[in-house]
A protein has these predicted regions:
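NAD(P)-dependent short-chain dehydrogenase/reductase
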Residues: 152-206, 212-214
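Active-site segment of SDR-like NAD(P)-dependent oxidoreductases
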Residues: 79, 110-117, 170-173
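N-terminal Rossmann NAD(P)H-binding glycine-rich loop of SDR-like oxidoreductase domains
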Residues: 2-27
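Conserved Rossmann-fold NAD(P)-dependent oxidoreductase catalytic core, especially the SDR/UDP-sugar
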Residues: 92-142
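Active-site YXXXK catalytic motif of short-chain dehydrogenase/reductase
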Residues: 143-147
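N-terminal Rossmann-fold cofactor-binding loop
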Residues: 37-41
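NAD(P)H-binding glycine-rich loop region in Rossmannoid oxidoreductase-like domains
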Residues: 54-97
Length: 218
């Protein structure tokens, strides 16, 4: 059986994968052990015999050793690129001590394509355009720039014969979404509490969502 390590596992993607595994879906891929690194991990009371979950309740910068695993999902993020770089460098340092090179998935974002001015579907062949990224306002600009920065780091890691995949994720919905600060969460929580639903836009907005189970299965 295989072992999986999720770095930054308290976020929506990390928690969704854990729930997916608890419901026996990861057994298909022969994963029966999950390690979760997170400073703010929301511990799940897992009583399932088919899968074991271990929490490492620390910051990446405070970790000197990680368990030997077959797969790593890197979900760590920080709007400060300097701090994000420190996380990655610490990860790289620890990775060198692994006896066997694990497969690595970095969760990037569709934000790296920049602001979609023409309202057309982004294609994987589309090149990253820093001018379009600069068209973002607020937190999203920093978020996109951090993802671009880390993508380059993981591409360099792939050149060292690591099996690296980069997932440019967009918007998701699922069981855990109501616990996170997203637009769709606000709408659902308002409806559940029978409050007025407020849309912070004066124009028609169209948004597509992937379910977290489909994300985890992929």
């Amino acid at each position: 059986m295989k072992k999986l390590l999720i770095l930054g596992g308290s976020g929506f993607i990390g928690s969704s994968i854990v729930n997916y595994g608890i419901n026996k879906n990861l057994i298909i891929n022969k994963i029966n052990k999950i390690y979760i690194l997170s400073r703010t991990a929301k511990f799940l009371q897992n009583k399932k015999k088919h899968i074991s979950i271990t929490y490492i309740n620390k910051s990446m910068l405070d970790v000197n050793k990680l368990p030997q695993v077959d797969y790593i999902i890197y979900c760590l993020k920080n709007s400060n690129i300097k701090i994000s770089n420190n996380y990655f460098n610490q990860f790289l340092k620890i990775l060198k001590n692994f006896k066997k090179k694990p497969k690595i998935l970095f969760t990037s974002s569709g934000a790296v394509y920049g602001k979609n001015i023409n309202k057309k579907k982004d294609m994987e062949s589309k090149k990253i355009d820093n001018i379009l990224i600069d068209n973002f306002v607020g937190y999203k600009k920093k978020y996109a720039k951090e993802k671009v920065f880390l993508e380059e780091k993981f591409k360099e890691l792939a050149k060292k014969n690591y099996n690296v995949s980069i997932a440019r994720c967009y918007t998701f919905i699922g069981k855990n979404i109501i616990y996170y600060n997203y637009a769709i969460s606000d709408l659902i929580n308002a409806a559940n509490s029978k409050k007025k639903i407020i849309l912070n836009s004066h124009i028609d907005v169209f948004r597509s969502y992937m379910h977290s189970d489909d994300l985890s299965n992929w």
